Amino acid sequence: MKDAEIIEVLRRKVDVPVGRHLYGIIGSYDSLNRFSSELSKATRTDGSPFPQPISVNKGLLEFFSDTEFRTTVETEAKYPQPTRKKIEDAFDRFIRNHLKEYGLIILQDLELVFAYNVNLNPLRTLAADERKIILLLPGKRSDKTIIMYPHCTEGENPLPTNLIAEDHLWLLDV
């Protein structure tokens, strides 16, 4: 879809006060940057601007002190599950804090979340009623599956099925 068409649908959907509000925009890094720029110029139906996208990678790293981060990196290969749990907990706190403060958040740069296979299903519960999340996801559609980071050589990273409702998920034109 064209950027303007997606933005128009988002304008209507995010201002509905009840229901699930987890949205996904899928495209290349270039098309996501273009879309993000266009979305930042758009206003919601009440005239307020859409918020600027938030880098999840940067936000997660800020949850760790320098010492804790160094220890985590040094022990990651030996203890991958505790590292994954730390990232998952930091992601949960990050999302909850931003939703509480802003209500509507746009998330980009989710590479750490996918690299550590963080469970994304809590996003469905958190993004409801007055709390809304828009995910900017680098990926492509392959049959009925969304493949995240399709240029990654480490294998496929499918977006969990049923995470985002089909009518809340859009593929950007190139």
Which residues make up each language-model segment?
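Glycine-rich P-loop/Walker A and Walker A-like loops and their local beta1-loop-alpha1 context
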Residues: M1-G47, V118
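Short amphipathic alpha-helical segments and helix-helix/interface helices
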Residues: S36, S40, I95-R96, L120-A127
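Conserved P-loop NTPase "ATPase switch" module shared by AAA+ and STAND
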Residues: L99-N117
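Residue-level preference for the first positions of well-ordered beta-strands
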Residues: R20-G24, L104-I106, K132-I134
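AAA+/P-loop NTPase substrate/partner-engagement loops
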Residues: S48-T71
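Short acidic, S/G/P-rich loop/turn micro-motifs used as interaction or catalytic elements
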Residues: D30-N33, L60-E62, L110-Y116, K140-S142
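Short glycine-rich substrate-engagement loop in P-loop NTPases that contacts/grips substrate
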Residues: E68-R96
